[in-house]
């Protein structure tokens, strides 16, 4: 947090425009992520709240939520306020038997979801129906006004998120009244071999590989920090 003397600065303005972030070189100094690992509400005021803190606010509608933050020492991520669980996507729109992304076969050690997503977008952006596959859907995901940096997480990143799955699921059900996670598996952007890719079955606490042509859901994320 930036301080003026001993006072925390909570709003930074450039003229009449509110500044969302300040960097010193490549280091983000405003705003800071929460110091404690866990699940947070990212509010429209661009602050992170624990769920108990959020419940004390005057307006606790989902419309006040820009996303849910997973803060972990191995990686922190912003998740959408609500995931479209009714849509099914193939892993890629074509070339189901082709190597597409790097780090093939490393499985849970892959933490390069953003890179994987960009490679697939570059490969398929001119293919008819290119938004009908998991990484294409995630790349074009713009549900809230916080930028266009969404991507399909790698299997390693999904497993970090999965550590907080029960807490996030319970909190969202209690406060907002809907189930955040689906009974369907989530595709990762990690390829296992020429014909299969990794997915996370959050409902059954398992991860495995599946044929790229199979239909599963997708969880877009933004990397934080």
Predicted regions and their residues:
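Intrinsically disordered, compositionally biased repeat/linker segments
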Residues: 1-32
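A generic structural signal for short, solvent-exposed coil/turn residues
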Residues: 4, 14, 71-72, 179, ...
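Generic structural motif
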Residues: 7, 17, 27, 85, ...
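A broad, structure-centric signal for solvent-exposed, well-ordered loop/edge residues
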Residues: 11, 21, 31, 87, ...
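Short hydrophobic/aromatic-rich beta-strand motifs
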Residues: 12, 69, 185-189
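Short, compositionally biased
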Residues: 23-146, 212, 218-225
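C-terminal, surface-exposed recognition/capping segments
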Residues: 147-149, 155-225
């Amino acid at each position: 947090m930036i301080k003026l003397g001993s006072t925390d600065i909570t709003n930074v303005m450039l003229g009449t425009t509110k500044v969302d972030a300040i960097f010193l070189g490549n280091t983000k100094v405003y705003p800071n992520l929460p110091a404690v690992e866990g699940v947070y509400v990212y509010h429209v005021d661009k602050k992170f709240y624990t769920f108990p803190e959020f419940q004390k606010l005057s307006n606790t509608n989902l419309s006040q939520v820009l996303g849910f933050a997973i803060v972990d020492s191995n990686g922190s991520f912003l998740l959408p306020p609500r995931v479209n669980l009714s849509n099914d996507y193939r892993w890629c729109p074509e070339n189901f038997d082709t190597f597409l992304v790097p780090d093939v076969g490393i499985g849970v050690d892959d933490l390069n979801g953003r890179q994987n997503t960009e490679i697939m977008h570059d490969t398929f952006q001119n293919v008819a129906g290119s938004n009908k596959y998991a990484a294409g859907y995630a790349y074009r995901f713009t549900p809230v006004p916080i930028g266009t940096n969404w991507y399909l997480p790698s299997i390693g990143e999904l497993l970090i998120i999965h550590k907080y799955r029960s807490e996030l699921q319970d909190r969202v059900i209690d406060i907002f009244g809907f189930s955040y996670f689906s009974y369907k598996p989530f595709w990762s952007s990690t390829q296992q071999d020429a014909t299969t890719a990794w997915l996370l079955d959050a409902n059954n606490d398992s991860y495995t590989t599946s044929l790229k042509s199979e239909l599963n859901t997708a969880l877009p994320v933004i990397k934080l920090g």
